[in-house]
Amino acid sequence: MHVKAETVLALLTPAPPSVVGQHVVDLSGDGWTLSSTALNRTVPGHLPSQVHLDLFEAGVIDIMASMILTFVGLRMPIGRIPATRLKAYFESTWLVFDGLDTFATITFCDQHVGSTDNQFRQHHFDVSQILKECKQDPVLRINFGSAPNIANTIAKSPDAEEWPPGVQITNEYPNRWYIRKEQSDFGWDWGPAFAPVGPWKPSYIVQNGHAELYVLNTDIDIYRQGQINYLPPDQSQPWIVNASIDFLGPVPCKPSMSIEIKDAATGSVLSSGLLQNVTVSGKSITGTTTIDGDAPKLWWPSGMGKQNLYNVTITVQNDMKKSLAKVTKRTGFRTIFLNQRNITDDQLAQGIAPGANWHFEINGYEFYTKGSNIIPPDAFWPRVTQARMARLFDAVTAGNQNMLRVWASGAYLHDFIYDLADEKGILLWSEFQFSDALYPVNDAFLENVAAEVVYNVRRVNHHPSLALWAGGNEIESLMLPMARRADPTGYSKYIGEYEKLYISLILPLVYENTRSITYSPSSTTEGYLYVNLSAPVPMAERYSNTTPGSYYGDTDYYNYDTSVSFDYNHYPVGRFANEFGFHSMPSLQTWQQAVDPEDLQFNSSVVVLRNHHYTAGGLFTDNFKNSSKGMGEMTMGVEAYYPIPSKSDSVANFSAWCHATQLFQADLYKSQIQFYRRGSGMPERQLGSLYWQLEDIWQAPTWAGIEYDGRWKVLHYVARDIYQPIIVSPFWNYTTGRLEVYVTSDLWEPAQGTVNLTWVDLSGKSIANNAGTPETVSFTVGALNTTNIYTTNISELSLPDLKDSILILSLSGEGRLPNASSKKAFVHQNHFTPVFPKDLSLKDPKLEVSYSPESRKFTVQATGGVSLYTWLDYPAGAVGYFEANAFVLLPGVPKEVSFVAQEGNVTDDWLQRVTVQSLWDQKVRD
């Protein structure tokens, strides 16, 4: 299918041929036309954009109608052209596209310019001669092909690689693994399958004079002298700044490079002068300089210190000292290292189990990684704005998170997103875009991937927030075992192909372009046996290790058997948890953005079909069978542990059920995060927790903690609480009755304090003799460690009624945050009930909420009993978060809570419509 779309460029501007310089035309804007022969429609277009967005704006389609839009990608190639003025006198003219999604054919002045087949690459085309020979007003055409159709065509070709049945994971559109496009565009279990096409990133026309260079890409690599990617850097060594520029234009004669490094906050100059060892390789110029190791202020992640940043300006000159190109990038000085080295004798002596490490170290310090996994924040990247991402990242830091895993296969993040992470101290574990599939290894595919890898590694390498490059998502831990089960005799072939792509190809490309970042071939891995960069396979992976008592690598864990959700004996014991979770419903307010009122029922067709867990496995618009399984899992989770909503009003009942699924999700994540954090002081020396997932791509049941419009689910509030630096946590074996209480700290030095243990009944009255439990326990917890402060058995306690009892755990301590000059106070509160919430003899807490304009805070109080899961909720019209939520509130102890408005208009009327509820309200029939 071909689409013809065109706009005429303005007449060339005459000028004397001696005029030199550079003329760059940004093609962004509204002066484009989108035409489709499939729909026989022509509508106004935009750049950057994608087909669905312009059709939606023109009123042709409704983006909310997901079952229809699934097929638009099959029928809607796109063409766009801007109108602008070009200069006739420049020596060279280039078309530069930062991102075309995905299969595009470009013509200029009716002449074929080139084609693209990779969404993740920057493309540039020399149109100098075409422009000179153009006899009429120049016309630019970009014709986009259907990615699903082209993927299917490739799959049917005689030389297409095939895999055993059942290995490749099809969510909706098949054959995604054959093409270099955002894999989740073909459907995933948390999002739609729109398969958009279009110019999703900015595009330019670049005109150069005789000697000028246009900077396509910049690689600034900052590392300690002698640093090697997979070994811990020596923090006593000076800094090396390696600057490399990729350019368009003639190779300069005897070029030189100069550098100026300024403090981004104060403007003071850290270093300036000529770079040394300047070399030219192809269309890249590279030079280095050395900076005293103590001169720069270090960049630290959130919660560990300041995010000190520097502006680095690189200038390229020719042998006549004429400036040919200049570029400025903001960066920071830090080392970040993924330690996968074998456990040492010293570590064994400390009680750490044998095996290998798997944790991150920042500037030479190991730290506890706290965070989540980020997916594409929208099905259409042109809608992702800086303001929207700033709001999301505010929620990340407010949630006490210091790292996000940038999941494959979405897309490589835009530079402005890394900029935000740099500012806010959010480490970004980044991945190449391969996920839950085996991929071809033919020469053409590998060549395409190589260009993609080099471009993106170089593009983002200057960001101090960059923490890791991983080869792909779950390839080693999921796909290789699936291949072995499906084809045991051919398993060596799939291992060989895996190593050819992720180790023999990608690893050397990463290490050739950065000395500062570690590379791991897969997101979930047991690490490596050894690294030999001169070997054909430079890293020997440790596959399927079963050594008893030894721990290797990181873990992911999903268990939808809700009967064992809170049995921590089922949680994986490892060095680092990089994925775990369970899905829940979004709030009523979010559903109302996407669903008609008559469909606001838990099992309505629209609601069920927006649940893509489990996916259709093909292009089916009536996936009730698989979707119902996921709905059933949420239902069973609620029914097993929480009061079952049964309200007379159908919308209120739907809202209560949505909230109930969020309670289950939040408690499950809390249980696991506490377990993993406690592992910091256990033999496994567990030093990381990244839950699945941070945010939503649309309004639907997913694993997200933040809904599509930015509203926090219960999960994000609970994760914020349990990610505090020092926490107190109960661990209950409900089979044996054993109860243990631990204090866990991620500070870098010991902390001290006390924990009050208070038993009350659900009316709020103290239980006699505190049920035989000590009222106060002192603690000292080591750096990055945990300590047991109390152990008992429920059968040994003097509890009159297990169903009418709750233990309140209140921690008060003192410690020093990393890089802080003085100690500070820490408080944390947790609770424990000896039966699950559904079996509690709940009392009506008689909650009241009021707002004070003077303090700008809400006051919540309970007058009738203990309020469990106290939940403040706000109406539509604004987006933000409460500073505390989903907490326990004792009668007679009012709590003040602020609301942080991120977007929208918080009026007096809006404030008065804030509501409060508790677990009691879940069971009350209105």
Curated annotation (Swiss-Prot):
Gene symbol of the encoding locus: mndA
Family, similarity comment: Belongs to the glycosyl hydrolase 2 family. Beta-mannosidase A subfamily.
Record organism: Aspergillus fumigatus (strain ATCC MYA-4609 / CBS 101355 / FGSC A1100 / Af293)
Catalytic residues of the enzyme: E474 (proton donor)
UniProt-listed Enzyme Commission number(s): 3.2.1.25
Protein name: Beta-mannosidase A
Pfam hit, one: Glyco_hydro_2
One MF annotation (Gene Ontology) recorded for this entry: beta-mannosidase activity
InterPro entries attached to this UniProt entry: Beta-gal/glucu_dom_sf, Beta-mannosidase-like_N2, Beta-mannosidase_GH2, Beta-mannosidase_Ig, Galactose-bd-like_sf, Glyco_hydro_2_Ig-like, Glycoside_hydrolase_SF, Ig-like_fold
Signal peptide: 1-21
Primary localization: secreted
Assembly behavior: Homodimer.
Compartment(s) where it occurs, according to its Swiss-Prot or TrEMBL record: Secreted
Lineage per the UniProt record: Eukaryota, Fungi, Dikarya, Ascomycota, Pezizomycotina
Keywords: Carbohydrate metabolism, Glycoprotein, Glycosidase, Hydrolase, Polysaccharide degradation, Secreted, Signal
GO annotation, cellular component aspect: extracellular region
Pathway connected to this protein: Glycan metabolism; N-glycan degradation
GO biological process terms held by the UniProt record: glycoprotein catabolic process; polysaccharide catabolic process
Function according to Swiss-Prot or TrEMBL: Exoglycosidase that cleaves the single beta-linked mannose residue from the non-reducing end of beta-mannosidic oligosaccharides of various complexity and length. Involved in the degradation of polymeric mannan and galactomannan.
Enzyme class (EC, first level): hydrolase
PANTHER family assigned to the protein according to its UniProt record, in alphabetical order: BETA-MANNOSIDASE, BETA-MANNOSIDASE A
Residues glycosylated per entry: 40, 242, 277, 311, 342, 532, 603, 626, 653, 733, 756, 785, 793, 819, 905
Keyword Secreted appears in the UniProt entry: yes
Catalytic activity annotation: Hydrolysis of terminal, non-reducing beta-D-mannose residues in beta-D-mannosides
Disulfide-bond pairs as recorded: none
Transmembrane segments annotated in the record for this chain: none
